[in-house]
Regions:
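Exposed, interaction-prone extracellular/peripheral surfaces
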Residues: 1-176
Length: 176
């Protein structure tokens, strides 16, 4: 799932940075915190891609200090894209928190399709149970008005981005 997440983040960064939009990066989990401050252009894309190339799997699975800080410092004028296999509910909790602050948030689900293909029956059952819990958590996030989109390639976000653009032109209710 790390490979899918990094590829998805790279495609999204390329889409926005090369069109003059400001792009930043903050890892949410993992062994080492990675952050790239906001900027635009090809040089920024290179910085983001170089930083993502250094991301290592593992860690506690919880949010890194840089990820928590980036989420707290995000402003309402940005669209925040959270990419995760959504194994832990913490990313979804962060998405709901940002949405309640009035931010445009999209969650990209990068869990591979083959995750429950195990020879061990107990492992397969454990995965099925976790995936049922995960499905319930995703429904709750969707109910809060935050789209969760399965990553299927660069075109995965087209409709969601159009919907968010339409929503951001109207009045918004922000809970404080």
């Amino acid at each position: 799932s790390l490979d899918i997440t990094v590829r998805a983040a790279g495609a999204i960064a390329e889409h926005y940075a090369t069109r003059g939009e400001r792009v930043s990066l903050a890892t949410f989990g993992g062994r080492v915190a990675h952050a790239v401050p906001p900027a635009s252009g090809r040089a920024q894309l290179r910085r983001v891609l170089d930083r993502m190339a250094r991301i290592q799997p593992g860690g506690t699975g919880g949010p890194s200090a840089a990820g928590r800080l980036a989420v707290r410092q995000s402003s309402g004028s940005r669209m925040t894209v959270l990419l995760s296999p959504l194994i832990s509910p913490e990313v979804l909790d962060q998405a709901v928190s940002l949405g309640r602050r009035g931010m445009a948030v999209v969650v990209i689900d990068t869990l591979p399709d083959h995750v429950i293909d195990h020879d061990d029956d107990l492992t397969a059952i454990a995965w099925r149970i976790r995936l049922l819990e995960r499905r319930r958590e995703i429904r709750m996030v969707n109910g809060a008005g935050i789209p969760v989109v399965r990553w299927r390639g660069p075109g995965s976000l087209d409709q969601v981005i159009r919907d968010i653009a339409r929503r951001t032109t109207g009045p918004r209710l922000v809970r404080r």
